[in-house]
Design a protein with these regions (language model features):
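Short, hydrophobic beta-strand segments that form beta-sheet elements in well-ordered domains
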Residues: 48-54, 121-123, 187
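Glycine-rich phosphate-binding loop signature in dinucleotide/nucleotide-binding domains
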Residues: 4, 86-91, 115-117
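Short phosphate-binding loop-to-helix
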Residues: 56-110
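Residues at the starts of beta-strands that form the adenosine-phosphate
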Residues: 7, 47-49, 91, 119, ...
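Conserved alpha/beta core of the MobA/IspD/sugar-nucleotide pyrophosphorylase nucleotidyltransferase superfamily
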Residues: 6, 153-212
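Conserved core of the sugar-phosphate nucleotidyltransferase
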Residues: 103-176
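N-terminal glycine-rich phosphate-binding loop and ensuing alpha1 helix
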Residues: 3-53
Length: 212
């Protein structure tokens, strides 16, 4: 099977009350809210693209029919899993973070090529800063994800390509590292998470410092 034989949906989870930067999905860049810019960039890659959100305020900025309302959810993966029945026609569901302002097809393609052959794939760029989420990996497999300034690992990017059965089981998985509060750690111990290197030259909008 190759990437041309599978049906892919990009799904962007977006909550209104973000914890570190208030209502960041609605912050405007060049006159457009962040969520709309990320949505448009993904949509223009040629993939069916959706936003799953708890906010009518966010939903109104998205093409009619492509915003799906959810209840309260603990993280983005859980938000997608809560409305999985909306994506029955797709072979792969790609979770792209709504704060990835500079997302490009060049960033996404290595993840998609890998996930054709695997259950879960995510990605990294070489090197990391102390405040980055880090992935420690070996031979293409994730061993651990952490926010801690451990002094090693690579910068983890918030992109995940899932086979639907992973999302179907997500709420049943125990989180072996609850102190990290990282959604992907819940999958570790149940399934291998493949990691691939990619390129991402932009920012992720997480704090006020990222706005300048």
């Amino acid at each position: 099977m190759n990437i041309d034989d599978i049906k892919i949906a990009i799904v962007i989870p977006a909550r209104l009350e973000s914890s570190r930067l208030k209502q960041k999905m609605l912050i405007k860049f060049d006159g457009e809210p962040l969520i709309r810019l990320v949505y448009d960039k993904c949509r223009l890659m040629g993939y069916d693209t959706y936003v799953v959100t708890d906010s009518e305020e966010i939903a109104k900025h998205i093409t009619i029919g492509n915003a799906i309302m959810t209840g309260d959810c603990e993280n983005g993966t859980a938000r997608i899993a809560s409305v999985l029945d909306k994506f029955k026609e797709y072979d792969i569901i790609v979770n792209v973070q709504g704060d990835m302002l500079d997302i490009t097809k060049k960033t996404l393609d290595p993840v998609l090529r890998d996930c054709v052959h695997n259950d879960v794939t995510t990605c990294y760029t070489k090197g990391c800063k102390p405040n980055d989420v880090k992935v420690i990996h070996q031979e293409g497999h994730a061993l651990w994800f952490t926010r801690a300034p451990v002094g090693y690992g690579d910068r983890h990017l918030g992109i995940y390509a899932y086979r639907p059965h992973i999302l179907r089981s997500y709420d049943l998985f125990d989180d072996e590292y609850p102190q990290e509060r990282l959604e992907q750690n819940r999958i570790l111990g149940h399934y291998n998470i493949q990691v691939v290197e990619t390129t991402y030259d932009g920012v992720e909008i997480n704090t006020e410092q990222d706005l300048f």
